[in-house]
Amino acid sequence: MAKMHTKRKGKSSSTRPIRTEPPEWCKIGAEEVTTITLDLWKQGVSTAEIGMTLRDRYGVPDAKLITGKKITTILKENNVYPNVPEDLTNLIVKALRLRKHLSVNKKDVHNKRALNLTESKIRRLVKYYQQEKVLPRDWFYKPETAEMMITR
């Protein structure tokens, strides 16, 4: 798949095997995966890192195969998932980092462009989440208040 703001192609990766049930060598249960997921989330670990930890440390090939739910669904059912989706949060944190860098290095034109592209991605993602009714219609990204939104 192509990248958004360049002419280059993205990284290719291997496809995961198609499975409908967990493998027989996986001995961990659904309740245990749920408790591990909630414990890791309380420690401040992202959902992608939770999946990698489950895979590497506990031998869980896919949390959805064992529990029947995605990691974000498990977190939403236990009312611990934040209101702003994680990919949008990561982009906002990146934009805040770039703004902080540009406040010190005012002539850095390459990172000015990077900030412009990042904020374009944020606006595009906000529009998508508003259409999908994940975010309310009156929610919008404002760089001045973005840091307060993320720390909440």
From Swiss-Prot:
Alphabetical keyword list: Ribonucleoprotein, Ribosomal protein
One GO CC term on file: cytosolic small ribosomal subunit
InterPro entries: Ribosomal_uS15, Ribosomal_uS15_arc_euk, Ribosomal_uS15_N, uS15_NS1_RNA-bd_sf
Spans annotated as Disordered: 1-22
Keyword Ribosomal protein appears in the UniProt entry: yes
Keyword Ribonucleoprotein appears in the UniProt entry: yes
GO biological process terms, semicolon-separated: translation
Basic residues composition bias: residue spans: 1-11
GO molecular function: small ribosomal subunit rRNA binding; structural constituent of ribosome
Record-stated family: Belongs to the universal ribosomal protein uS15 family.
HAMAP family: Ribosomal_uS15_A
Subunit record text: Part of the 30S ribosomal subunit.
PANTHER family in the record: RIBOSOMAL PROTEIN S15P/S13E, SMALL RIBOSOMAL SUBUNIT PROTEIN US15
NCBIfam families in alphabetical order: PRK08561.1
Protein name: Small ribosomal subunit protein uS15
Source organism of the structure: Methanosarcina barkeri (strain Fusaro / DSM 804)
Taxonomic lineage from the root: Archaea, Methanobacteriati, Methanobacteriota, Stenosarchaea group, Methanomicrobia
